[in-house]
Amino acid sequence: MIEFQQVHKTYRVAGREIPALNPTSLTIEDGQVFGLIGHSGAGKSTMLRLINRLEEPSGGTIIVDGEDVTAFNASQLRGFRQQVGMIFQHFNLLASKTVADNVALPLALAGELSRSEIDKRVTELLARVGLSDHAKKYPAQLSGGQKQRVGIARALSTNPKILLCDEATSALDPQTTASVLQLLAEINRELKLTIVLITHEMDVIRRVCDRVAVMDAGQIVEQGSVAEVFLHPQHPTTKRFVQEDEQVDEGEQRDDFAHVPGRIVRLTFQGDATYAPLLGTVARETGVDYSILAGRIDRIKDVPYGQLTLALIGGDMEAAFARFKAADVHMEVLR
């Protein structure tokens, strides 16, 4: 478990103190994939790097597995960092070393394994990330996605309990991003690693995370399960991220719907309810006609969800609303 207890970070620049992270408390459970999302300058990178003390906190306490990381001396910190892997946006591979040597580097520096043991471990790691045939290649011979897979293998080399991902997919194309996220999900599931990732893309959060914290101006403005935050955003920053992900402009949508008669509602379905024939049933039972104005079906991690924007006309409107709520469908009345 990772706990932030009123942790804050301030930089001193040209004689002025610039807050990067306001006093923040947060708990990340073992085995979770936890996402920190925010625009540039929100404080997410600072928060991530505080976990392994690449950034030193200005105050507060960071507890990992019951131990106060902020109180570690240099020797304790070195040992702790071997339990925390990290992957980066720009891969940070050594150009003069082969793929195998890049992955072996942390093990060689630790000095705890023989050469044959290191070679065996590297072979296992390259197989896990799908690069067994690339061991003798150099970084310049790899695609961006392959470079990131090398970075992931290197981060796993010391059998960490925690994996920190610093914008790990932001330099990749959508297809490669999807494959890297799938790999991270497999690693989380099979190795029971706690993964903390930062991103500015809601799609990344939706694909792989269990819980998410939304950051803005150095503070967490909203947090919860990905389904709660993604489907029912409360803070304006969260709503902007969701709109960007859905590629929806609410102002334009309101204008488009201005001429549509009746009540306009947005329904959100999760799990099995996503595929249930609810609209037809409600229409028959209440006499309410409907027009579908917008809709989508997608997934949050492995759970399907659907959203429909409807115009409802005639019949027993209150009975229709009650029927939607009884079916455990979230309903938002837009007009």
UniProtKB/Swiss-Prot annotation:
Belongs to the ABC transporter superfamily. Methionine importer (TC 3.A.1.24) family. The complex is composed of two ATP-binding proteins (MetN), two transmembrane proteins (MetI) and a solute-binding protein (MetQ). Gene3D superfamilies: 3.30.70.260, P-loop containing nucleotide triphosphate hydrolases. Part of the ABC transporter complex MetNIQ involved in methionine import. Responsible for energy coupling to the transport system. Signal peptide: none annotated. It is an enzyme of class 7 (translocase). ATP binds at G38, H39, S40, G41, A42, G43, K44, S45. GO terms for molecular function: ABC-type D-methionine transporter activity; ATP binding; ATP hydrolysis activity. Keywords: Amino-acid transport, ATP-binding, Cell inner membrane, Cell membrane, Membrane, Nucleotide-binding, Translocase, Transport. The keyword Nucleotide-binding applies. The gene is metN1. PROSITE patterns: ABC_TRANSPORTER_1, ABC_TRANSPORTER_2, METN. This is Methionine import ATP-binding protein MetN 1. Residues 2-242 form the ABC transporter domain. One of its GO terms (cellular component) is plasma membrane. It is found in: Cell inner membrane.
